[in-house]
UniProtKB/Swiss-Prot annotation:
<feature type="modified residue" description="Phosphoserine">
    <location>
        <position position="649"/>
    </location>
</feature>
<dbReference type="GO" id="GO:0016197">
    <property type="term" value="P:endosomal transport"/>
</dbReference>
<keyword id="KW-1003">Cell membrane</keyword>
<dbReference type="GO" id="GO:0030950">
    <property type="term" value="P:establishment or maintenance of actin cytoskeleton polarity"/>
</dbReference>
<dbReference type="Pfam" id="PF20400">
    <property type="entry name" value="BAR_4"/>
</dbReference>
<protein>
    <recommendedName>
        <fullName>Phosphatidylinositol 4,5-bisphosphate-binding protein SLM2</fullName>
    </recommendedName>
</protein>
<dbReference type="GO" id="GO:0070941">
    <property type="term" value="P:eisosome assembly"/>
</dbReference>
<dbReference type="InterPro" id="IPR046869">
    <property type="entry name" value="SLM1/RGC1-like_PH"/>
</dbReference>
<dbReference type="GO" id="GO:0035091">
    <property type="term" value="F:phosphatidylinositol binding"/>
</dbReference>
<keyword id="KW-0597">Phosphoprotein</keyword>
<dbReference type="GO" id="GO:0030036">
    <property type="term" value="P:actin cytoskeleton organization"/>
</dbReference>
<dbReference type="GO" id="GO:0005886">
    <property type="term" value="C:plasma membrane"/>
</dbReference>
<dbReference type="GO" id="GO:0001558">
    <property type="term" value="P:regulation of cell growth"/>
</dbReference>
<dbReference type="GO" id="GO:0051017">
    <property type="term" value="P:actin filament bundle assembly"/>
</dbReference>
<dbReference type="GO" id="GO:0072659">
    <property type="term" value="P:protein localization to plasma membrane"/>
</dbReference>
<dbReference type="GO" id="GO:0005737">
    <property type="term" value="C:cytoplasm"/>
</dbReference>
<feature type="domain" description="PH">
    <location>
        <begin position="445"/>
        <end position="555"/>
    </location>
</feature>
Amino acid sequence: MSYQRNSARASLDLRSQYQQLEGRMRSEHFNPAYQQQQQKGQNIPLSLPSSLAQRNPIPYPIDAVTSDPTIPAQLNVYDHDRQNSIVDAAAGTNTTHSLNSNNIPSSQNNNINNNNINNVGSFTDPSMLTLPKMSLHSHQKQYDSNQNDPRSPLAILIPTSAQPTDVLSARFSAWRNVIRAILVYLSETASIQDEIVRQQLRLSHAVQFPFFSIENQYQPVSNEDKSMQKFFLPLGSGSVQDLPTMLTKYHDNLASLASKSSKELTSEIIPRLEDLRRDLLVKIKEIKALQSDFKNSCNKELQQTKHLMKLFNESLKECKLGTPKSDPFLIKLQLEKQIKRQLVEENYLHEAFDNLQNSGAQLESVIVMEIQNGLTSYARILGKEAQVVFDSVISKLDSTILNKNTNLEWDSFILRNISNFVPPNLPMRRFKEISYSNQNDPFTFEVKSGFLEKRSKFLKSYSRGFYVLTPSFLHEFKTPDKHKFSTPLMSIPLVECTVTEHSKKTKSNSEQGKNKFILRTNSNGLIHRGHNWVFKVDSYDDMIEWFGNIKALSSLPNYDDKCKYVSKVAKLSKEKAKSNENTTESVTPQVTNEQHTRYDDVSSSNFPLNSIPKLDNLTITNTTSSIPETNDSQIQNRVPEFYIENVDSPRKSNQL
């Protein structure tokens, strides 16, 4: 019998015990005092036969299958997220390949391919071979702690290759054997009405728990019985495995005192347990149908995250050395997108574990409750006998399995099988809780972004594009929507650029929108000639800000100076954003005198322009990847694109 994923998962969810018991409890012979004690989590005392006579079993044929309308909706959302993550994974793989092929030399690519990512940080890492013994021990200890850190993107805290449905099916199959053993025992009890002595011997042999230990009498022999025994608490813990020992002792002590009434056994207790056992077989099939929910690609996503993390750290190292081949800003976008994709897959698997474990816990609670009800009814029958009956078995049942929480076995089972199940109180991880080294490095900041117009090389017309200025590059993107495009159409390394001049502030220029500046890329030989990039900005103040930032970043000599400058710009941006939030009236954005002075000082600084290293690193790529979302509500009216003008163009000075 086949099941769909969502329907199978939803069908396993059980109604609460109180909903299932509603309308099924008998009104006759129901003791209010016993109900009050049950609400307090206590069992009725078994010291008097009269109290047992008042304790009526609850007729409870299990009906564990219900449809919770909220569960399929949640599962559909997770299935949709998972499908999107798979599509994004394919797109992310292509984007990463494009980025690596353009920004990393072939020799470096070969080195990356030859290095095993899983080998990093382990004792087989060549960099670890020369460390002292204590350093190796400390490194391994730190590596193990990172694998269990819920904030680390390189840690997966839930099992990814487990088979929980097989384990749980085997567990409930063992429960069916427990119920079968109880049924055999109770059936034999109902047949000893006239032959007390002979029937007591029969009942002694009817205690058939092949995988449970019986004190001083029996121990499981076969491997199958021993494996089933591990599903339950050990002998002496007061749980279900103590039951066969107590029953055997009881029949040895009551060979001549048994006087039974089989009517209640054959009409109520046995049929209910038989219904429970039949329904449990259906539940086992439903559990096995959930096996496909635990097929996942978490390990594949983790390897991709490790790969991008390595590229991210290498790019930052290159930027700090002053010879960047790829921008950490772009790789960080790819890394964060991959982490989100990994968390979607991981949380889908986590949700599957939660659904299976919660449903299994509820199902086992019903099973244990049914066994408790059956044994309670049986104890009431035994209470009609002499005090020896009470001393031999009833008091022991009441102090052990009848008084245990229904989740006692389940909680112990989960804790003993932590490699196959998720701990009950383990929360799901969120992206905002993820942290990694160099996450807020200044070289990953966005110095400035917005729309610019760039003059075409041949048509002399201007096209519009969205630009992002980072400490190392000037990138052109197709749109400001960073969720759709994470790889730029074009990237210009600032180490190969200088800004030469900009237009003057005049009334006519402001009216006609002719606020321009020229960005020159240096020549790298015969193949890559220098170019003059002519950009046009809507306002003069905005042009000065672009000009000043590019001039400063392309002229700063080392990593520390760039970090100080970027931190200063970021601080000013935060102060400006805070002041805009406190303003209640809408005003035209203006650049303050302090900003004019700052950028004018930058534009007039004496940084050596000829000391810029020459790198053949101009990147022009097309992509469909996404970059983080950018609010473009304040730049809606500025929509330019980029073009290149040859350095030999004679019209450069005439058109400014």
